[in-house]
């Protein structure tokens, strides 16, 4: 049996090849797959569960098929789809899980994060994150008409891309001290996250013991997946 972890697909109607690759990925799962964890930025933007764009509904249908075949599906918010709600998760046969969830991964506790909250040196982004994760701010946004929300999402996405182009690469990566801190706080020696688009396996030391941070890849020219089983962990990629 195995458990799969993916993130940062950034599904959007302008990137149909990524959606096709994701559907192919779902169809390839066998009865050996126990669970699929999607750790944020599944969608490139999320303006509410009431969005009438056909893409989210098509994705929900495919996820529901996988869930009906016996695979548990878990969704975590990212910095692009933090408004994703329980209504959509239920339609997709999925369960929303909080950032910082610790799971038992074949006898090994693993901390799951999207990863943006580890980038503490990017102070401008951290302030923005605090604002948009505020329940009152979110409620005000969701009360607006779909067209207004869609326009705001496009504006925020364009601003983010422009700002990131001017930032040093180092501040957009995780802060090593923060990684160790959250792992110590959670009492784990394994952290799995996405967000940075820098897939890799990083050995480190936490409380004097060997530990590991695994970074999931973004789906662009390649698909990425962490495949976990009782026999080990494998970070896999393939061409799209």
From Swiss-Prot:
Pfam families: Metallophos. It is a peripheral membrane protein. Pathway: Glycolipid biosynthesis; lipid IV(A) biosynthesis; lipid IV(A) from (3R)-3-hydroxytetradecanoyl-[acyl-carrier-protein] and UDP-N-acetyl-alpha-D-glucosamine: step 4/6. Binds 2 Mn(2+) ions per subunit in a binuclear metal center. Its EC number is 3.6.1.54. One of its GO terms (cellular component) is extrinsic component of plasma membrane. Mn(2+) 1 binds at residues 8, 10, 41, 197. The keyword Ribonucleoprotein does not apply. The keyword Lipid metabolism applies. It is found in: Cell inner membrane. Keywords: Cell inner membrane, Cell membrane, Hydrolase, Lipid A biosynthesis, Lipid biosynthesis, Lipid metabolism, Manganese, Membrane, Metal-binding. Its cofactor is Mn(2+). Substrate binds at residues 79-80, 122, 160, 164, 167, 195. GO terms for molecular function: manganese ion binding; UDP-2,3-diacylglucosamine hydrolase activity. One of its GO terms (biological process) is lipid A biosynthetic process. InterPro entries: Calcineurin-like_PHP_ApaH, LpxH-like, Metallo-depent_PP-like, UDP-diacylglucosamine_Hdrlase. Disulfide bonds: none annotated. It comes from the Bacteria. Mn(2+) 2 binds at residues 41, 79, 114, 195. It catalyses: UDP-2-N,3-O-bis[(3R)-3-hydroxytetradecanoyl]-alpha-D-glucosamine + H2O = 2-N,3-O-bis[(3R)-3-hydroxytetradecanoyl]-alpha-D-glucosaminyl 1-phosphate + UMP + 2 H(+). Belongs to the LpxH family. Hydrolyzes the pyrophosphate bond of UDP-2,3-diacylglucosamine to yield 2,3-diacylglucosamine 1-phosphate (lipid X) and UMP by catalyzing the attack of water at the alpha-P atom. Involved in the biosynthesis of lipid A, a phosphorylated glycolipid that anchors the lipopolysaccharide to the outer membrane of the cell. This is UDP-2,3-diacylglucosamine hydrolase. It comes from Cellvibrio japonicus (strain Ueda107) (Pseudomonas fluorescens subsp. cellulosa). The gene is lpxH.
